[in-house]
């Protein structure tokens, strides 16, 4: 009798464990898609206007937490609800912004003080400019470690880890 009880407990434990483990087989990490746009979540966008309110929730009746005042500022969308996008900036601050205030044109923010812009994507390449911290530059293209940006009439390559607004593994032609 004691042996049957132990066997039945082990059997139940195995069944329970298989219910938890079986769904994990064949699971592949696919990019999450926005419920409204079907575009990747998260993704980077930019501020289309000179001033935009970031609200606590996705409607005009929600309190304004932040006012963004830099046109072309890169923002990361990490949620969608109807005509609203939940965004965060390079400091991790944000809120809900109406989609009409955002653009798919990509910009990046310079993280490092006087980031060296180079002629080619190599640490040995000629420095053609030094871009000040917090400048906003147009994102042109990216390879594994470098991105080509356009800033103040200069077009050159900067290390990917010196900018905000592009993902570590992102490639852009």
Where are these predicted regions, by residue range?
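Bacterial N-terminal signal peptides
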Residues: 11-23
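Glycine-centered signal
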Residues: 5, 25-26
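Beta-strand-rich domains and repeat architectures in extracellular enzymes and scaffolds
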Residues: 63-64
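Bacterial N-terminal signal peptides that target proteins for export
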Residues: 1-14
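SH3-family beta-barrel domains
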Residues: 28-56, 67-71, 78-81, 85-93, ...
């Amino acid at each position: 009798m004691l042996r049957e009880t132990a066997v039945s407990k082990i059997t139940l434990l195995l069944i329970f464990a298989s219910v938890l483990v079986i769904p994990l087989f064949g699971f592949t990490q696919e990019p999450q898609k926005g419920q409204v746009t079907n575009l990747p979540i998260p993704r980077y966008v930019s501020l289309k206007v000179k001033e935009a309110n970031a609200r606590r929730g996705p409607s005009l009746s929600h309190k304004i937490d932040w006012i963004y005042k830099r046109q072309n500022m890169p923002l990361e969308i990490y949620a969608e609800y109807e005509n609203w996008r939940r965004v965060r900036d390079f400091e991790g601050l944000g809120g809900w912004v109406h989609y009409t205030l955002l653009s798919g044109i990509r910009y990046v923010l310079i993280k490092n003080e006087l980031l060296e812009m180079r002629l080619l994507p190599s640490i040995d390449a000629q420095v053609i400019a030094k871009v000040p911290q917090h400048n906003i530059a147009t994102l042109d293209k990216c390879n594994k470690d470098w991105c080509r940006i356009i800033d103040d009439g200069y077009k050159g390559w900067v290390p990917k880890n010196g900018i905000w607004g592009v993902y570590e593994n992102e490639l852009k032609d």
